Swiss-Prot record:
Its EC number is 2.7.7.-. This is Cytoplasmic tRNA 2-thiolation protein 1. It is an enzyme of class 2 (transferase). Belongs to the TtcA family. CTU1/NCS6/ATPBD3 subfamily. It comes from the Eukaryota. Keywords: Cytoplasm, RNA-binding, Transferase, tRNA processing, tRNA-binding. GO terms for cellular component: cytosol; cytosolic tRNA wobble base thiouridylase complex; mitochondrion. Pathway: tRNA modification; 5-methoxycarbonylmethyl-2-thiouridine-tRNA biosynthesis. Gene3D superfamilies: HUPs. NCBIfam families: TIGR00269 family protein. One of its GO terms (molecular function) is tRNA binding.
Length: 373
């Protein structure tokens, strides 16, 4: 016999919420999901009226639901935000080209302006080119670093104040586990922050080993001058999928063809096992991360700017410039190694090799020339 919704008591329940265990009807599920995201936004004071906000749009379930919910809440609660879709084309044939078609449909469905910025345009290399050169061992490192800087540069060209990404509660919990397993104490303290912060913007929410430029200081601002936040910080992945399903949203569901062996996948599998035993494990891990405090003697990176492209970095050269130089020299391993390694130091001293194309100079947020399509 169908059971009634435990919230309204009148409609037939269609699902049991993974997050709370409540049996809810479709309308109540939509309401509580959207209300919880709104509460997260308000309590964290993510936006200011008049902000220009870029939604990182990949065409996947998280960013598609985020775009829909941001548009809905902006209208319902009169946030006064100017919303944009920002997509990064990594140049992955059979994956990103297809997902971008979904993003373009979302643009029409939601009526939100879209900007697309490609790796080929910015770096002179697509991910297909990079994988052909280096193989699949470290490709997530290259992609994560390049994507992060590309997002900032795309946002700057739009003249936005804020970037929001679709990282959900599962992603946050996975990141805590990854940083524990890697022994990355400095990153562990700030990896659950809803607003990206840290001396060099390292928040560890991607599969790469080095990240830079997302923000700095406790305000969430960094050398880019653009805030980043995660409105879905407490939203379970399963509930995002259910929301997309019941709303019949148009999203792309294929995983990246180059990421089957990414380190994050192992943390994800472990987390799913924990969740099957104790559904609250996801939120419990996030709260544990939030309550961690790093001892004062832990060395923190000093914020600088890249001497080559001007982007924020904790080293003389930002990680994107280091990786790009390695690719252009025909020695991509140089970019993956530590800046303190002998091979890297010798390469830096070698002025005879052509470093090839460099990244355009960082010009900051360009409000006067901001454009989207």
């Amino acid at each position: 016999m169908p059971r009634e919704c435990e919230l309204c008591g009148t409609e037939r329940a269609v699902l049991r919420r993974p997050k709370t265990g409540d049996l809810v009807c479709r309308a109540c599920f939509f309401h509580v999901f959207e209300t919880e995201v709104h509460q997260t936004i308000v309590e964290a004071q993510l936006f200011r009226r008049g902000d220009r906000v870029a939604i990182g749009a990949s065409g996947g379930k998280d960013s598609t639901v985020l775009a829909y919910v941001m548009k809905t809440l902006n209208e319902r609660y009169d946030y006064g935000l100017n919303l944009f879709l920002l997509s990064i084309d990594e140049g992955i044939t059979g994956y990103r080209d297809d997902s971008l078609e979904t993003v373009k449909r979302n643009q029409e469905q939601y009526g939100i302006p879209l900007k697309v910025l490609g790796y080929k345009e910015l770096y002179g290399w697509s991910m297909d080119d990079i994988v052909a050169s280096i193989g699949r061992k470290n490709n997530c490192t290259f992609c994560g670093v390049f994507r992060r800087q590309a997002l900032d540069r795309g946002a700057a060209s739009l003249g936005v104040d804020h970037i929001v990404t679709g990282h959900n509660a599962d992603d946050m919990a996975e990141t805590v586990l990854m940083n524990v397993l890697r022994g990355d104490i400095a990153r562990l303290e700030r990896c659950t922050d809803i607003i990206t912060k840290g001396p060099d913007g390292v928040d560890g929410d991607e599969d790469d080993d080095e990240t830079e430029g997302c923000g700095a200081g406790r305000s969430g601002f960094g050398g880019s001058g653009i805030r980043r936040s995660k409105p879905f910080k407490y939203a379970y992945e399963k509930e995002i999928v259910m929301y997309a399903y019941f709303k019949q949203l148009d999203y792309f569901s294929t995983e990246c063809i180059y990421s089957p062996n990414a380190y994050r996948g192992y943390a994800r599998a472990f987390l799913k096992d924990l969740e099957s035993i104790r559904p609250s494990s996801i939120i419990d891990i996030i709260h544990s991360g939030e309550n961690l405090h790093v001892a004062g003697q832990v060395k923190r990176a000093v914020q600088r700017t890249c001497t080559r492209c001007g982007y924020i970095s904790s080293n003389e050269l930002c990680k994107a410039c280091v990786l790009l130089e390695g690719l252009n020299r025909g020695a991509p391993a140089l970019g993956v190694r530590s800046d303190k390694s002998r091979a890297v130091r010798e390469a830096r001293l070698d002025g005879t090799s052509d470093i090839g194309r460099t990244i355009p100079r960082w010009e900051g947020v360009q409000r006067s020339s901001a454009t989207a399509w």
